[in-house]
Amino acid sequence: MNNLNYGVIGNCRTAALISQNGNIEWLCFPDFDSPSIFASMLDREKGGAFGFEVSGDYRITQNYVPHTNILSTQFSSDEGEFVVLDYMPCYRSQDETGHYLPAELYRYIHWIKGKPRFKINYHPAPNYAQGQVILNITPQYIESYCSFDNKDRQYLYAVSYTHLTLPTN
């Protein structure tokens, strides 16, 4: 673990660590004391991550949107540019706590210009990477869970205004 330069997003219920190249490398979900889903910062081989693969000519910069906990990772090259905005929502509510903290993480991919080419790598490793990961892929979402604990499931939803191709089983 040579590089500890991570962005942090969270909502007072849990938090994620996002590397300089836009990979979620640590996330316990849905709560701080829950088992990890992504832990590649500890084990690159089987820890799990959720990120982007771009060619070597991309320049990647990262900063926070001013006055927010929204992390912006910008990918730029001669062929195109896009930005990824990462955040976890926290809403005001009328209950005794005053806040609603859903177990949700958002990764908004925004096209800036050109024709950027990238690959999304989604490799969850639920429950501290103990057991086989089961992925159910549908046109609307990817469901993932650990083979020995099928009650704790995570869903990755993809919404796109352009053509999006998800692999099938």
Describe the residue ranges of each PLM region.
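Acidic, contiguous internal or C-terminal segments within carbohydrate-active enzymes
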Residues: 80-126, 164
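Extended, loop-rich substrate-binding clefts of extracytoplasmic carbohydrate-active enzymes
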Residues: 57-102, 136, 140-158
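Compositionally biased, intrinsically disordered low-complexity segments enriched in polar/Pro/Gly
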Residues: 2, 156-161
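Conserved small/polar residues in nucleotide/adenosyl-binding loops
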Residues: 162-168
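Short aromatic-acidic-glycine turn motif
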Residues: 127-134
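Beta-strand-rich N-terminal accessory domains
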Residues: 1-49, 59-85
